[in-house]
């Protein structure tokens, strides 16, 4: 399995299993099957509400812990410095682990403590209510305590990362962002290379199975794109495999989600597909700057956040 080297010298598997949208009752079986196939990288989050089942699967893993890479994420309601370590400890308890390999700030958005999804204006905290450097310092203390080896961010712009790094003692290892041929994120890819921050691509297949409330009318379907389908035929592969191969060819970590044993194997085998320059050129022409996961549900009339602030500041 291909790995990338982080600034710390640690090696992260380039391919992993996403667990967002994996339903209770399905995810334990899926993770066990993935580990059996040879997956070594699991991407989790407290808000996915399935870390307990992931932990049950991890408890049955017969291999050594150091062979696995496990990522989780700090939810928006636990950004106060005093809430960071308890949130991480809860995740470790659920995952049945003594430490994570990577812990990310899930979104640069603050909720009041204990809120899962805000239902009123008073459950949002404004961006400046909790300076990101304070949350980050609490994460650094978690590294020093041995609870996580690396820390990073998710859904952060370059400007927000720059603000964080002005006072950071530990630089972000990863920025996990939506990334696929319809949202190629070239500027962020270049920024990451310049700063030594690796990108992880979430929703690499277009997140067609996300909740209806997060979908827009007449949105494009990535897996049905003609160029992707033609490239798949050329390589005797599936469209999903081409999308995974494309992400790997650009030097990003990729974490497709599936609970289907057949697709778990197909996704794993995508690591063997090598796209040529012509393939990459054709796919590079597909960029629409289209976000399937745009955070609009955080930018309601009750919220102090806007899409412009989220993605452009």
Tell what function each PLM region has.
Residues 22-35, 80-95, 134, 159-162:
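Short, acidic/polar
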Residues 84-105, 141-145:
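CE4/NodB-like, metal-dependent polysaccharide N-deacetylase domain
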Residues 7, 55-67, 92-96, 165-168, ...:
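Acidic (Asp/Glu)-rich catalytic clusters
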Residues 76, 109-313:
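Beta/alpha (TIM)-barrel catalytic core signal, keyed to glycine-rich beta->alpha loops juxtaposed to Asp/Glu
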């Amino acid at each position: 399995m291909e790995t990338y080297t982080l600034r710390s010298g640690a090696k992260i598997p380039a391919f992993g299993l996403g667990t967002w949208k994996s339903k209770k009752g399905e995810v334990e079986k899926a993770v066990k099957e993935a580990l059996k196939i040879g997956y070594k990288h699991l991407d989790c989050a407290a808000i996915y509400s399935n870390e307990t089942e992931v932990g049950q699967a991890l408890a049955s893993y017969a291999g050594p812990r150091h062979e696995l890479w496990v990522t989780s994420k700090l939810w928006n309601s636990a950004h106060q410095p005093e809430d960071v370590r308890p949130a991480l400890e809860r995740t470790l308890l659920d995952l049945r682990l003594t430490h994570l390999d990577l812990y990310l700030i899930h979104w640069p958005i603050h909720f009041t403590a204990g809120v899962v999804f805000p239902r009123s204006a008073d459950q949002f905290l404004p961006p400046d209510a909790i300076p990101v450097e304070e949350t980050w310092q609490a994460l650094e203390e978690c590294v020093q305590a041995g609870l996580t080896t690396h820390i990073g961010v998710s859904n952060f712009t370059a400007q927000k990362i720059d603000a964080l790094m002005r006072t950071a003692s530990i630089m972000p290892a990863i920025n996990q962002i939506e990334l696929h041929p319809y949202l190629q994120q070239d500027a962020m890819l270049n920024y990451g290379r310049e700063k030594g921050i690796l990108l992880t691509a979430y929703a690499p297949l277009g997140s067609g199975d996300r909740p209806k409330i997060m979908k827009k009318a007449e949105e494009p379907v990535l897996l049905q794109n003609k160029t992707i389908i033609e490239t798949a035929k050329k390589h005797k592969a599936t469209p999903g495999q081409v999308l995974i191969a494309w992400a790997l060819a650009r030097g990003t970590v990729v974490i497709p989600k599936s609970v289907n044993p057949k697709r778990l194997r197909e996704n794993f085998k995508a690591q063997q597909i090598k796209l040529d320059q012509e393939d990459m050129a054709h796919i590079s022409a597909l960029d629409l700057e289209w976000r399937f996961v745009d955070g609009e549900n955080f930018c309601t009339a009750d919220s102090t956040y806007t899409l412009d602030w989220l993605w452009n500041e």
